[in-house]
Design a protein with these regions (language model features):
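Flavin-dependent oxidoreductase catalytic cores
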Residues: 1-111
């Protein structure tokens, strides 16, 4: 019989590739339509991800991000295909990495 003191699996560490997560709760991609009209992520994305990545060993998967202009189809969804978009994502990453969580980008194609 399991001890009542045993940590539930959800809150136990797990190794995913080279990364060890401190728990198994992952922020799934939530496309929030908050980028600028030019599909450039703004400061609100940096704030959003740094808040949610504040617990060490957390994993965040960013909102859906267009890989090209032709792959898009929705307004205010961030892209990662122009210099301005890439620079903005770098800013988001710098702010996010001040927090101890990990993040990956969810790439999206709408055809």
């Amino acid at each position: 019989m399991a001890s009542m003191q045993q940590t539930p699996a959800l809150f136990r560490p797990i190794k995913v590739g080279r990364i060890t997560l401190r728990h198994r709760v992952v922020l799934a991609p939530l496309t929030r339509f908050r980028a600028y009209a030019s599909h450039v992520p703004g400061p609100q994305q940096a704030s959003y991800y740094s808040q949610r990545g504040s617990v060490p060993g957390s994993l965040l998967i960013t909102e859906a991000t267009f890989i090209s202009h032709d792959a898009g189809g929705y307004g205010h969804v961030p892209g990662i295909y122009t210099d301005a978009q890439i620079q903005a994502w770098k800013t988001v990453r710098v702010v996010s990495f001040v927090s101890p969580g990990l993040s990956y980008t969810c790439l999206m194609v709408c055809l």
